[in-house]
Curated annotation (Swiss-Prot):
Database matches in CDD domains: ABCF_EF-3 (cd03221), CD_eEF3 (cd18626)
Alphabetical list of Gene3D superfamilies matching this protein: 2.40.50.990, Leucine-rich Repeat Variant, P-loop containing nucleotide triphosphate hydrolases
GO terms of molecular function: ATP binding; ATP hydrolysis activity; RNA binding; translation elongation factor activity
Gene name, Swiss-Prot/TrEMBL: TEF3
Transmembrane stretches, start-end: none
EC number in record: 3.6.4.-
Binding site for ADP: T418, N735, E944, N947, H973
Repeat positions for HEAT: 112-149, 151-188, 192-229, 231-268, 269-306, 312-353
Organism listed in the record: Mycosarcoma maydis
Protein name, UniProt field: Elongation factor 3
Domain of life: Eukaryota
Top-level enzyme category: hydrolase
Any single Gene Ontology cellular-component annotation: cytosol
Keyword list, A-Z: ATP-binding, Cytoplasm, Elongation factor, Hydrolase, Nucleotide-binding, Protein biosynthesis, Repeat, RNA-binding
Signal peptide range: none
Length: 1066
């Protein structure tokens, strides 16, 4: 935007030496006199007189770009550049333009340079005078530094044409130098234009002039540095080498790339560098090389965002692939090529070989010119022809890039619209909005510009990009936050919601206000275990970021529900809900301008969710950004929704329901439903001995009492429950009522203090803890595949060995020592281990081995006898091992594990090639769910499963639970989730359980009968090999034998009895 005269430091009357009379004439004698005076000073302007250039600059700052035409300066410059006999005039014209660009009126002269002298300046780099060559290059560099990045495409066409076809090598080296300058001046646009740049550069690097070769190869390295794809970043030097030395380097580079797993979005810049290599690779002789090229094409194309990106390259890849498909002899390699062809056609939306594909329609600049003039006319503005044409070019380029961000259009167009004499900032904004709406409509897009965009105080208005590991999450996204607004951050798992909040907290968002300007606080959803011994009040007072007195801390804790006793209790004793309230108390005391709330309702009961809702609704001085999967909470709290989609952030006013009305495809955020292409599948459990119906109890508790050491009262009192394969139980209750404690008893993490507890010996339980990530926290640098191979490497679940029921108390150790001594036939024997098990009436007997004795001396001992001897832990350990063995008839191999993870919506790329540290929160929970169900559990226990799964994943989980053949127990505060899943309620309150909706039974006489499924004809061994099962001959029953004998007797009587029948009789 042109500065006001006062801002530019221009005096009311301009003292001038070279154009002294020009300003006075402008005020007194009109335009004719101005032109005459300026024309008289032509020699001074073209001689490089800095005072004359400065006076002209000051005048242009006052009068705007019209001054150039009114004073005849444009004609002077054109005349100077075209004066073939006067090198000083040519140099002076270049220098004058450079001075104007560098002295603050670049936008004013930009349309003139672009429309009138760009070609002349490029050609001047080949002038016979070195001074003119140098001056023209410096002028072009100065112009590139001030021009709008959205004009780069048209400038690039001129530069690339001259670089390829110019007869003078100085022009070529100058163009290459200009390309390097453009890389610095407008890197994002240059990256997008790489498909146009690379083909030209591959020619220029082979120019016959050594100077051109050297300069272009150096420039190619700088240009390739614009490619942001992390997957190929380390291969860029090899890719450049393959362009320079294709015969030697192409096979080597393809070999390098074939071992790469592509996970990041593939853009046009990446394809521009890769396609020359791949196109040449298709012409290599070895079949293996062609196959690798097809694999790379297939993998990369799957990561292309839309057909506009891939279409320019179809003609270079599809014909080659189709040709080798018909010539390859290897059927496996041919199938790979066919897959690549199919992927290219699907993504590019073509049917043929791509050679006759019409380019996607771009916006016509002439039609855009009419739109610009119309929009200006609506605001009673009229631009000069050069400025109007330049605006049309910028608008067309924005539309062709499908960039319809209002902030981008305003920042691009307003500086030029305000150059029009008499224009005001409000008019410029109105023109930008009008053009944005019109161009979006002409391209088939719809853009909503909300009236409240400019209302209220801005806390943040920045544009930035964000990546997580190798994955681009946001690309030139705009984030604008207003004071007092509550923003709900919506997007699918992996879109970058939590990563964005972390980046804001860590100061990694470019342009976000510093902590000195805006106070930002990230509300953690969990507390570090190292703080567990501190009391709640001590923990608050120990935080150096909170400048408050002890009284303020006590008062705030009272406000969020902590009485004096709870304030002085250790953090370790708090439930998840109370820990969240501690985190909220810290945020209140910090007096933040922006609160970042990541799943604030996790672990909170209904009462506390109501409290935090009321707090946020009444919070007028601070802004909140909220990530939550609780649709009711977002509806009650949010004033706006920020939608993370296709690497951008789009704001929608209103709550979640209003957002869904505007964006119907986002309905999954508000409703628990899922499409056919997004589902979970829980593995069906194996049959259990003695269990004939789904309703027969597998776990029983009666009058169980449990108390943590050091606590004043029991956490569970008189609990009686049953669980079966038919169970669908919601465990409900306020925070701290004992829900998680009960679950820990069920899964064996703890043991009851008193009362009876029984589990079926072969029972397998799958468990996902309240803090789900604790399962994988020690393995974040492993891939999900490696984690599974570690956890189940022995055929048992290694997490089982960490449970409390595997450790012996002192009393149990003493009883075990006495019970280990067996007296058999008068001889003492010392118990060693249990090595086998078989049925004994309604129970089991176990094969016991003894120390220093052979296996021939083993004895079978009933289960009750072993338990009475204090060997219950050994019995339970063996039962657990047997249960796992029975459920582990699936091979622990890569293919089987990948299939299992795909049942939970985790793609193979993430399973085998991404470490868990790089997965989103939702993806990590999928890993935890899949790992917990690998052993095909009979009962699955989920502690707060709604905490980290998005709406679509929740819907998929509900659907999977409906079809699951085992039992399910769920702790949740989500009424929507529990009502959609469970028919039985266990209401916990202060350690007491009240069950309702149950149908408990201990017999097999009633309920749904279990039927043994037919076994598959094939099975996979531990090495992943597939084998056919031999069908066993059916054992002949006594009834069958009697029937066969009767048939033989009848044949004997009828005279049809033969020798074969005689053998059968024998």
């Amino acid at each position: 935007m042109a500065p006001a005269p006062s801002a530019a430091g221009v005096p009311a009357t301009v003292p001038a030496k070279a154009v002294k009379g020009a300003a006075g004439a402008a005020a007194k004698a009109g335009a004719a006199a101005e032109k005459k005076e300026a024309s008289a000073e032509t020699d001074a302007l073209l001689s490089g007189d800095k005072d004359a250039a400065q006076e002209l600059t000051n005048l242009v700052k006052i009068e705007g770009p019209a001054a150039l035409a009114n004073l005849g300066i444009e004609a002077v410059i054109l005349k100077g550049l075209g004066d073939k006999k006067n090198a000083t005039a040519r140099e002076g014209a270049c220098t004058l333009l450079a001075n104007l660009c560098e002295q603050g009126v670049g936008h004013e002269v930009e349309p003139f340079i672009f429309e009138n002298v760009l070609n002349s300046l490029v050609e001047a780099m080949g002038d016979k005078e070195k001074a003119v060559q140098k001056a023209s290059l410096e002028t072009l560099k100065a112009f590139v530094r001030v021009m709008s990045p959205w004009a780069a495409q048209q400038v690039l066409k001129v530069v690339l044409h001259q670089a390829r076809t110019a007869g003078k090598w100085q022009v070529k080296t100058g163009c290459v130098a200009l390309l390097e300058e453009m890389v610095t001046a407008c890197p994002e646009r240059m990256a997008a234009l790489m498909p146009e740049i690379i083909p030209v550069m591959t020619e220029v690097i082979w120019d016959t002039k050594t100077d051109v070769q050297k300069a272009s190869r150096a420039a190619l390295t700088k240009l390739c540095a614009l490619i942001s794809n992390k997957d190929i970043e380390r291969f860029i030097p090899a890719l450049i080498n393959s362009l320079i030395h294709p015969v030697e380097e192409v096979p080597k580079t393809i070999q390098l790339l074939s071992a790469t797993t592509f996970v990041q979005e593939v853009d046009s810049a990446t394809l521009a560098l890769m396609v020359p290599l791949l196109s040449r690779g298709l012409n290599e002789r070895p079949t293996a090389t062609k196959r690798k090229v097809a694999v790379i094409i297939d993998n990369m194309t799957k990561l292309v965002d839309n057909e506009r990106t891939v279409r320019p390259f179809l003609g270079k890849l599809l014909p080659g692939l189709i040709k080798i498909e018909s010539t390859l002899a290897d059927p496996e390699a041919r199938s790979v090529v066919q897959r690549a062809i199919k992927t290219l056609r699907e993504v590019g939306k073509v049917t043929g070989d791509g050679s006759d594909v019409k380019p996607l329609e771009d916006v016509d600049i002439k039609a855009t010119q009419e739109q610009v003039n119309k929009a200006l006319g609506e605001q009673s503005l009229q631009a000069q022809a050069d400025l109007s044409s330049y605006l049309a070019v910028l608008v067309a380029n924005l539309a062709n890039a499908r960039n319809f961000e209002l902030t981008e259009w305003e920042s691009t167009l307003i500086p030029y619209i305000t150059l029009i004499k008499g224009s005001k900032p409000e008019q410029a904004k109105a023109v930008a909005k009008s053009l944005l709406t019109a161009l979006a409509k002409s391209t088939g897009d719809t853009v909503e510009i909300f009236d409240d965009e400019e209302e209220g105080e801005d806390l943040c208005n920045c544009q930035f990009s964000l990546a997580y590991g190798a994955k681009i999450l946001l690309n030139t996204a705009t984030l604008r936050l207003k004071r007092g607004h509550k923003y709900g951050l919506c997007g699918r798992n992996g879109s970058g919601k939590s990563t964005l909040m972390r980046a804001i907290t860590n100061g990694q968002v470019e342009g976000f206000p510093s902590p000195d300007e805006v106070r930002t606080w990230y509300v953690e959803h969990d507390l570090d275990g190292s703080e567990g011994l501190m009391t709640v009040l001590e923990f608050i007072l120990a935080d150096e970021r909170l400048s408050m007195t002890r009284d303020e801390a006590v008062a705030t804790l009272h406000e969020v529900g902590f009485d004096d006793a709870r304030q002085n209790s250790p953090i370790a004793g708090l439930s998840g809900g109370w820990k969240m309230k501690v985190a909220l108390a810290r945020a209140i005391l910090f007096k933040a301008d922006i609160l970042l709330l990541d799943e604030p309702t996790n672990h909170l009961d209904v009462v506390n969710v109501k409290w935090i809702t009321d707090y946020l609704v009444n919070l007028k001085t601070a802004t909140a950004i909220i990530v939550s999967h609780d649709s009711k909470f977002l509806n009650d709290v949010c004033t706006d929704i920020l939608h993370l989609n296709r690497f951008k952030i789009k704001r929608y006013p209103g709550n979640l329901d209003a957002f869904v009305k505007r964006v119907p495809e986002a309905r999954a955020y508000a409703e628990l439903n899922t499409g056919e292409d997004y589902s979970f599948k829980l593995p069906d459990p194996p049959l259990l001995d003695g269990v004939k119906t789904k309703e027969k109890s597998l776990i029983k508790m009666k009058d169980v009492v449990f108390q943590y050491p050091g606590t004043p009262a029991p956490q569970l009192r008189g609990v009686s429950i049953q669980l079966s394969l038919a169970s669908r139980v919601a465990i409900l209750g306020p925070n701290g009522s004992g829900k998680s404690t009960l679950v820990k008893l069920i899964v064996g993490d703890t043991e009851p203090g008193s009362g009876e507890m029984w589990k079926h010996p072969n029972l397998v339980i799958g468990y996902v803890a309240q803090h789900a990530f604790h399962h994988i926290d020690q393995h974040l640098d492993k891939t999900p595949l490696d984690y599974m191979l570690w956890r189940y490497q022995t055929g048992e679940d290694l997490e089982e060995h960490m449970k409390a029921n595997r450790a012996l108390t002192a009393e149990e150790e003493a009883a075990k020592k006495q019970g280990e001594v067996f007296v058999i036939e008068g001889v003492k024997r010392l118990f060693d281990e249990i090595v086998g098990r078989k049925k004994l009436k309604n129970s089991f007997q176990y094969e016991v081995s003894f120390k220093n004795m052979s296996s021939a001396d083993n004895q079978w001992v009933p289960r009750d006898d072993l338990i009475n001897r204090g060997l219950e832990r050994a019995v339970l350990a063996f039962d657990s091992k047997e249960a796992q063995r029975l459920g582990m008839n699936r091979p622990l191999v890569r293919k089987e594990i990948e299939n299992h993870f795909e049942d939970f919506g985790l793609e193979r790329e993430f399973t085998s090639h991404n470490t868990m540290r790089g997965l989103s929160g939702g993806q990590k929970v999928k890993v935890v769910l899949a790992a917990a169900t690998w052993r095909r559990p009979h009962i699955i226990i989920l502690d707060e499963p709604t905490n980290f799964l998005d709406r679509e994943s929740l819907a998929a989980l509900i659907k999977a639970i409906e079809s699951f053949q085992g039992g399910v127990g769920i702790i949740t505060h989500s009424k929507e989730f529990s009502e959609g899943t469970c028919k039985e309620i266990w209401a916990m309150n202060d350690g007491v359980l009240v069950a309702s909706g149950h149908d408990w039974t201990e017999s097999n006489s009633k309920g749904t009968k279990l039927e043994k499924k037919e076994e598959d004809d094939e099975y996979t061994d531990a090495m992943g090999n597939v084998h056919k099962k031999e069908k066993k001959a059916k054992k002949e029953s006594a009834s069958d034998r009697r029937k066969a004998k009767k048939d033989r007797m009848a044949r004997k009587k009828a005279g049809t009895y033969d020798s074969a029948d005689e053998l059968e009789d024998l």
